[in-house]
């Protein structure tokens, strides 16, 4: 895989890119960064581009719109080694299964003490850093407390609140937000050679998640969205057996759960907006305004806001090892109460519920 040579080629994240460019241009790269923000919006790709630039012995320095720009050359042995995953001064740590384990952190520690082989720094990218188990996190903290001068550690996380506060406090935090759809659509036209309509639909369906937009098939994404939204119909929510099988199905994997929660969250956002948006220009699901309008008519604004708050809490605070189906079930039960117009304070959950192992 060929990683980007310049930040300009990565859509969005202007602030993050400016901070990182300045760090390299002034040779003030921090020892530890935390790249945080929602999943699939380009944090890891930016980290790879940053490391590639930092490692390249012939970076191109320029200016664009009055700001300094920096690019790796993309052709030297160092750049090619980054692309092929064989650079001796770049190590990537990812969860082994669902966790980052102490063994992986020990490997990092054994490597970080040695001087870089080619470049001037050694780069370590810890993807999904919040997946470190407690033993790994404590081990990692020791490295963060006294990192060797030549090392750069980049923690990438969509759930930074799951990291130890002592880890967070030692990293320079760089926040990433999904790029605006208006920016993503032209980028997709250029990057993927799509027509304007197709690019807009793909930008919409990927919800600003550049990682998905860059690779996703618009037709498949649409089918997936419609499958998730199908679970929100009144008939299906009212059928307890169906509701529980949907919860299992739409939360089969952690990624699937994330997609389902995002899709529901955006749907609810659209439900709030649609009455005030006659030409549907502000909707994210721009292709289905009537469906959004019809669903929204049956539900109170308060219930929608309460569900959004619940989803927000679950996304941020639910521990990684929580039963995924249970998370989605909680949301669907809340929505069921919303569409049948009942308060959630009663024992509805218990009546319809079943015992989960
Ligand atoms: Zn190079």
Model-derived features with residue positions:
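Conserved alpha-helical scaffold flanking the Walker A/P-loop in AAA+ ATPase domains
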Residues: 18-24, 102-123, 131, 135-143
């Amino acid at each position: 895989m060929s990683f980007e040579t310049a930040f300009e080629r990565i859509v969005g994240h202007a602030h993050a890119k400016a901070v990182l460019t300045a760090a390299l241009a002034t040779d003030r790269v921090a020892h530890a960064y935390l790249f945080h923000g929602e999943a699939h919006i380009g944090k890891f790709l930016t980290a790879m581009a940053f490391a590639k630039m930092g490692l390249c012995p012939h970076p191109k320095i320029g200016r664009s719109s009055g700001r300094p720009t920096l690019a790796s050359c993309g052709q030297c042995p160092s750049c090619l080694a980054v692309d092929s995953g064989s650079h001796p001064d770049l190590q990537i740590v990812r969860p082994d299964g669902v966790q980052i384990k102490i063994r992986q952190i020990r490997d990092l520690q054994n490597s970080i003490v040695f001087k870089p082989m080619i470049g001037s720094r050694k780069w370590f990218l810890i993807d999904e850093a919040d997946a470190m188990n407690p033993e790994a996190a404590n081990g990692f903290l020791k490295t963060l407390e006294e990192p060797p001068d030549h090392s750069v550690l980049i923690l990438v996380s969509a759930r930074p609140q799951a990291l130890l506060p002592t880890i967070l406090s030692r990293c320079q935090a760089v926040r990433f937000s999904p790029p605006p759809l208006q920016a993503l659509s032209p980028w997709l036209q250029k990057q993927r050679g799509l027509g304007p309509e197709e690019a807009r639909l793909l930008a919409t369906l990927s919800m600003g998640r550049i990682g998905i937009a860059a690779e996703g098939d618009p037709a498949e994404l649409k089918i997936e969205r419609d499958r998730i939204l199908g679970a929100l119909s009144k008939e299906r929510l009212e059928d307890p057996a169906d509701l529980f099988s949907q919860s299992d199905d739409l939360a089969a994997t952690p990624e699937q759960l994330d997609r389902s929660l995002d899709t529901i969250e955006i749907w609810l956002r659209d439900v709030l907006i649609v009455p005030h948006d006659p030409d549907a220009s502000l909707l994210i699901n721009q292709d289905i305004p009537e469906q959004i309008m019809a669903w929204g008519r049956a539900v109170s604004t308060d219930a929608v806001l309460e569900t959004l708050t619940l989803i927000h809490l679950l996304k941020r605070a639910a521990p990684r090892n929580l039963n995924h189906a249970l998370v989605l079930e909680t949301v669907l039960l809340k929505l069921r109460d919303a569409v049948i117009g009942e308060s959630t304070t009663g024992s509805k959950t218990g009546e319809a519920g079943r015992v989960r192992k």
